[in-house]
UniProtKB/Swiss-Prot annotation:
PANTHER family per the UniProt record, alphabetical: PTHR31836, SRCR DOMAIN-CONTAINING PROTEIN-RELATED (PTHR31836:SF28)
InterPro entries: Expansin_CellWall (IPR051477), Papain_inhib (IPR048197), RlpA-like_DPBB (IPR009009), RlpA-like_sf (IPR036908)
Protein name: Papain inhibitor
Gene behind this protein: pi
Localization: Secreted
Organism for this UniProt entry: Streptomyces mobaraensis
Amino acid sequence: MREFRRVRRVRFAACALVAAATGITLAAGPASADIPIGQKMTGKMTYYTDKGYGACGTPIDASSQDLVAIPAAWWTTPNPNNDPLCRGVSVEVSYNGRTIRVPVRDKCPSCDRTHIDLSQAAFAKLAPLDRGVVNGITWKFVR
């Protein structure tokens, strides 16, 4: 009986430790309310041409569709399909007197917080493709 109680305590302690670690992990990311809707940011844009499924779990073709991949730092859930960014959030991007609005459909793991990766189609509406990287853009999250 005594051995059973010890095993039970060890199991309970292990479960409590896992629960605490999970709680800390989940609490570490910003909540959906922390998406700074409307707050202008200055940064850079690049483009990509991937085809398949984006981080939001929907089919994408970055060579022909208007969309944006957002830096990993803005994603708040372990499963990006469930992330608030995938629920009607777009990005308004301005450069050189032009502005476009593109839906968030993907994640950019190599982008810092102010670097966005536009689809080739969207990038071409703001700058020539041969630029590849454009600094000095402004962008913001919009609904």
